[in-house]
From Swiss-Prot:
Record note on quaternary structure: Monomer.
GO MF assignments: 2-methylisocitrate dehydratase activity; 4 iron, 4 sulfur cluster binding; aconitate hydratase activity; metal ion binding; mRNA 3'-UTR binding; mRNA binding
Pathway: Carbohydrate metabolism; tricarboxylic acid cycle; isocitrate from oxaloacetate: step 2/2; Organic acid metabolism; propanoate degradation
GO biological process per UniProt: propionate metabolic process, methylcitrate cycle; tricarboxylic acid cycle
PANTHER family referenced in this protein's UniProt entry, alphabetically: ACONITASE/IRON-RESPONSIVE ELEMENT FAMILY MEMBER
Organismal lineage: Bacteria, Pseudomonadati, Pseudomonadota, Alphaproteobacteria, Rickettsiales
Nucleotide-binding in keyword set: no
Keyword annotations of the record: 4Fe-4S, Iron, Iron-sulfur, Lyase, Metal-binding, RNA-binding, Tricarboxylic acid cycle
Highest taxon, organism lineage: Bacteria
Pfam families the record matches: Aconitase (PF00330), Aconitase_C (PF00694)
InterPro entries hit by this protein: AcnA_IRP_Swivel, Acnase/IPM_dHydase_lsu_aba_1/3, Acoase/IPM_deHydtase_lsu_aba, Aconitase/3IPM_dehydase_swvl, Aconitase/IRP2, Aconitase_4Fe-4S_BS, Aconitase_4Fe-4S_dom, AconitaseA/IPMdHydase_ssu_swvl
Name the UniProt record assigns to this protein: Aconitate hydratase A
Reactions catalysed according to its record: citrate = D-threo-isocitrate; (2S,3R)-3-hydroxybutane-1,2,3-tricarboxylate = 2-methyl-cis-aconitate + H2O
Its EC number(s): 4.2.1.3, 4.2.1.99
Amino acid sequence: MSKVHNSEYIQELSVDNTSYKIYDINKAASDIDLPLKKLPYSLRVLFENVLRSNGSKQSLLVFKEWLKTKKSDAEIDFMPARVLMQDFTGVPAIVDLAAMRDAMKKIGGDPLKINPLIPVDLVIDHSVSVDSYAAKDSFNKNVQMEMKRNIERYAFLKWGQQAFNNFKVVPPGTGICHQVNLEYLAKVVWHKDGTLYPDSLVGTDSHTTMVNGLSVLGWGVGGIEAEAAMLGQPLTMILPEVIGVKLTGKLTGIATATDLVLTVTEMLRKKKVVGKFVEFFGEGLKNLMIADRATISNMSPEYGATCGFFPIDQETIKYLELTGREKTQIRLVEQYATEQNLWYDFEHAVEYTEVLELDLSMVHGSLAGPKRPQDRVNLNDVASNFKYELPNFALDNKDIDKKYAVANQNYEIGNGDVVIAAITSCTNTSNPSVMIGAALLAKKALEHGLKVKPWVKTSLAPGSKVVTEYLKLSGLDKYLDELGFNLVGYGCTTCIGNSGPLNPEIEETINKNGLVVASVLSGNRNFEGRINPLTKASYLGSPILVVAYALSGTLNIDLTNMPIGENIYLKDLWPSKEEIDEVIANSINSSMFIEKYSDIFSGTKEWKDLQVTNSSTYNWNKNSTYINNPPYFKDIGSKNNIQDIKSAKILAILGDSITTDHISPAGSISKTSPAAKYLTDHHIEPLDFNSYGSRRGNHEVMMRGTFANIRIKNEMCKGVEGGFTINQLNGTQQTIYDAAMDYKAHDVSVVIFAGKEYGSGSSRDWAAKGPGLLGVKAVIAESFERIHRSNLVGMGILPLTFTGNNTRLDLKLDGSETIDITGLSENISSYHPVKCVIKKQTGAIRTIDLILQIFTDNEINYIKHGSIMHFVVESLKG
């Protein structure tokens, strides 16, 4: 077998009288006695990828060995077909590429070697906020405000589009990247230079996994890994375990795809599938259309899996037809999948690492909350669940049921009242069944004389223009409008924390009385402080239930048994499956997809009017508070040996489930934060602070925003919420940023201690970049979430785990200790053991064992070079 081209496996496949080349995985499997039909479909895609990417016989044999034990510790190189980005993560990625060009020039290389070698699509969707709502002109007002706030960022992206090859930008106001990917960008089977191969991707957003519902293998990575992939570097990975989920039956009653994904999230999070593939199979697939599957795949990060994959079948073809893909492309998919044994075979049993079963008929109406997406609650238990959770919000129980008057209004609010009801997120707005269902419920509510409660902020932010088109065509848009669910934008909005301000009088009442009010949204995450700083409780649910809770205005109601209005119950308003299906059949067609996506890259007049300089390197403006040349390459070219960590101080001691939102928040910038001080020092008014997410192109803001989440709890500061620590150099309580800068000034390294699932949530690389710039050398935790561990390695930060059942709690740390980490050397290997020496102020010394969570040779190289970016630049220079 040739290691260079594997040319003996190139075969011809004729489709519509055109001949294409394919890499025949059946023949390659036969040559190594690999029973291909026993291999999970997701691994068949990887097998083809390795074969086509010049994989050696040894790398192909890894798949055969996998079948023996259904797991592996062998690594493979994955070469994705393309990269998907959104603007919050995309801007810093393009900043990094621009800085890499400068670095390449600095060390005497060719700056133009820094160029994407595979297609990169960036969709601007993360910057629109719900400033205006419940009005006909809300969309236009929010778009205008978005452009005003982000004109410098958008001009930078437009510069990048002309400066880099293979890089396209979908302008703002078009859609959400994952829904655009599902409905338009994804091909299922890619063809380039006459060769056919499975579509695959990585994305700089954790919910890139959504497209696995359309049988396109992909997952989220940090921006720095995505940059490496763009520049032709393979993504080295351990061949994962694959958990099979056998689906049977069909959804019944009021259960929707949203309820299904919340059930799957609850089930799989308990199963601990972090770092594993999940693959769905069974007769139940026949009862799930692609939109339902996409909802399930979207929330893979929430259940912890690398991806949730659905094989190609007839539903895939039907969706490609519905969304207006070219007929030739559809035939390519069908014939290629059949030829390569990628078409789902209901008769042939695949072998999985483990198999779980889920009967779809057992799924019930649900919400998930109040703080984690895996905490599913049956609809009839929501009120009691909220009451049970209230003490966890440090509430004084004596006033738990008290109502408080809102100034200048004729209503009162109290704990459990819903102040935000948002139909938002690609997770659900990509699914016509729940969107039509929400509109039909709105129609019936109005017919029964019901209105949304006046303290509820309502919004509709779909993931593509097709949604508003079919709502308009069906005549149902007017009912959502009348209830206040007017279009506010085509973007992520409330789901990522861009919910905008509440009514000032409501905000005052909440703050003055310490109320625990809630948001109900059709999103995928509800981590504390994420949706809005004032909604401590957030529940996820279907768009239909979002409308229902907007009508009730409170969580303190059992919607299954208590009336929403006078003698009006949820069952009186709930649309039947037949009603929903009839509207879908009459209102959704392929022509609307073709029309709405025909000018996807054009943009508004404001976008077209943005003027940029044609140049290969970026002209940095040192006074910019949005785009700044990062300091990652100051020591480019210098030898960066791995050294033991000596006399480090503890910057923070954190608990379980610390999310990337806690580490690097995306939402609003507090007026009292270090980032706010930096901005005001640069003459930026608080009204123009924008969000942390929008300023990820400026490292000065992002360093100051690291660990600045108002809900984070550092165990070194008892009873204090927010980004504070004890500076051991002077014994005072300071912001984490200020203390870190003091340590840096005194050449003192710092480390972090944490609990389980450190770095869960979004893929944001700033949750690794920020700590790196603060001087963090290592994070010591019980476990890491997949993407964040990779990001830490990519920034040269050591991810270390305890051995056995040890935890930070066993160590009885107070933060005053001095830390040594020994055993690091040029000869580190995967899962390298090291010693951690903890020196107490009393003089007591304790030594514990830790494991360095580095998996592959490439990751070892990243650590040795100081970061993945240094490694890539120096490799490309040659």
